């Protein structure tokens, strides 16, 4: 066998393996095929006579190939495989470019063989190469593959990509028309694939159904199932929805007892129950909830019908009389029993509601009879109701809130004692005095406040002629040396001399008075030193003495610019003495290390003295305890009243300072 035959067999084996791996739709395009003639049919060599199939083998034996073509052919096969993989990776554009510019070594192999003229054929046509015939036939075979096989190939291809490929395969649908079209013709463009998918969907639908359905036998006696939720109307015309109860179509037994009887409670049977199963349709019971309309069109609903009725006696009184409050009687009552329509009362407000019985203009969907609109109109100037909580002011200016008491224009029955003053807490407002046309009587203050001569505020019950209290005039105009509790308003009942004396004897300022022998620079030698300097303790020098010795008129006061001030802002340093121990060191405690060592603390106190009472030291401490203070008695005071000046065991019972001896 020649080298060319071996190489062509090897190329055919490689192409066959590639077709098995990638499907029958794979096209062996390792080398660009030579252009065909349009008139040359592909199937012409197949129709030839019997000796025709052996003709190509003779032509291969006759053709001589140089020995140097074997490595070039193997390299061309590898290059063709690389080009094919590159085409599948890049798409159609790279495939077209690869076909346009084939490898130089591949061109050497693509030299057309010389045709052999057959004697039995009328026309000698140039036979095509084996690769060309294989290229032209394979797309036809691939197009004839069943859709199930292409579907399986597409699924295996997606499964080879992993989980992501499987999810993409499932999300794209079960038909996978695009994947099958790509497997059938790998060189097809996206436009051609889309056209094939649309054509397949037009022919078979999106679910790839063939259009033929399996014959199904029609069920015998097929009847509709009863409705789960039914709707009917009672004898009163009310809608009832839900599971229908009753005899129905004679499918339920045991419900014949009381089928044509009425119930006294809520009506739940439909009107068709009586029309189908009963000979006579009963009269419905009175409605549980009734609705009536007033003369102004307002709807009144409730379980009890108000007004006069033929079945109710005892309510004839006031049938034809009008009411001033809310109108609740029906409009037809006056026509039935009075023979005339009563006059409409003055409207203070009215509402417009759509009725439940309106069918044509009902705005509510779903079949429920609920109101669809509720609008309330109120007049512009409604009658003002009295305030529940109203503020007012008494004669003393105190504010009171709450329900107003007393005589008012809108309150009747409170005339007795309305214009009289009360002696207790004043709660009557100014509007009551206005109604009585008289000034308000001011009552006495329950708690008074006044000021003393020293500027202090005193509150509470006051005594004296000013406050209308008798028996407390003694000592009102006397000057006291203790705490002042009498207000300045009491001075107007004293004479001028008594007032002047009170002013002279009244202590002024916060400096205490100094009595006795006053030391000072007057008549005492050696006392001038430091007489004009400030002291930090108690003042013992009077102001007149200081003015006589020192020039106090020109002296600088604290806060002035020439007042001496400390230049440095450093804190004053204080000398501290060395701290001495309060308890002298005694003898050490014998025993288990109870000494004044560095490792044991707290053994020099009363606990150590209790353990060893014979060794107490120079100034031993006695143990603390409440039992030591038992023999000590508290000092009995002279009087149980404290905090007052002049508290002595002898003297008058009552002093001017306010202190009393019990």
Swiss-Prot record:
Residues 120-135 have a biased composition (Basic and acidic residues). Residues 141-150, 391-404, 641-650 have a biased composition (Polar residues). N-repeat repeats lie at residues 8-27, 58-72, 147-168. Residues 632-662 are annotated as: C-terminal peptide. Unlike H.neapolitanus and predictions for P.marinus strain MIT 9313, this protein is not thought to have ribosomal frameshifting. C-repeat repeats lie at residues 564-572. Residues 28-57, 64-76, 161-170, 237-247, 289-300 have a biased composition (Low complexity). One of its GO terms (cellular component) is carboxysome. Residues 228-559 are annotated as: Middle region. It holds the Pfam family CsoS2_M. The keyword Repeat applies. GO terms for biological process: carbon fixation. Residues 1-258, 277-322, 342-419, 588-607, 619-662 are annotated as: Disordered. M-repeat repeats lie at residues 228-278, 288-338, 388-436, 446-491, 496-550. Its main location: other. The keyword tRNA processing does not apply. Residues 1-227 are annotated as: N-terminal domain. Belongs to the CsoS2 family. Has 3 domains; the N-terminal domain has 3 short repeats and binds RuBisCO. The central region has 5 longer repeats. The C-terminal domain has 1 repeat (compared to orthologs) and a highly conserved C-terminal peptide. The C-repeat serves as the encapsulation signal for the alpha-carboxysome, and is able to target foreign proteins to this organelle. Interacts via its N-terminal repeats with RuBisCO. Interacts with the major shell protein CsoS1. This is Carboxysome assembly protein CsoS2. It comes from Hydrogenovibrio crunogenus (strain DSM 25203 / XCL-2).
